[in-house]
């Protein structure tokens, strides 16, 4: 275990090495970010040092709607759903807006108690091409499979993620088709 972050070292290392934008937050307090990877930093323009310890609300801005914020808040601070997907308008460090599609899953211990929230982010502003969506889908499937395996080694579990992942992929494809028909 990485005692500084109180999370399995293998999970920490996997997130850092992943090619898709990943962030891991604590369940406790205000869900502070514990670790983010290079892809997350490239997408948002923030360094890891700037974001670790903070809730990801720093990505919200003047045009982020309450109707987009509330489902994220309910997921993070509620205990009903084990996973969810959330479209939200976020802002990079330089102030530019981007349409973020966030997939979140609770990582639970063997006793069923949530320990962490794993979030993957997709910039839908630039990912509205089929090839990019397909590539993101493949990377996300690989990432979820690897994280699930790593998590099991340390008594963590991702509950109900496969069905939600399939729904997310279908929705992303639908959004792409709708956008290309405009």
Regions found by a protein language model. Give the residues of each.
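PAS/PAC sensory module
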Residues: 21, 84-89, 94-102, 118
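Output-coupling edge of small sensory domains
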Residues: 25, 105-107, 122
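PAS-family sensory domains
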Residues: 26-27, 75-79, 88-95, 108-110
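Conserved hydrophobic beta-strand signature of PAS-family and PAS-like sensory domains
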Residues: 31-34
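PAS/PAS-like sensory domain cap-loop motif
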Residues: 40-51
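N-terminal sensory regulatory modules of PAS/LOV and PAS-like folds
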Residues: 48, 55-57, 63-64
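PAS/Per-ARNT-Sim sensory domains
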Residues: 60-77
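Sensory coupling linkers of modular signal transduction proteins
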Residues: 111-165
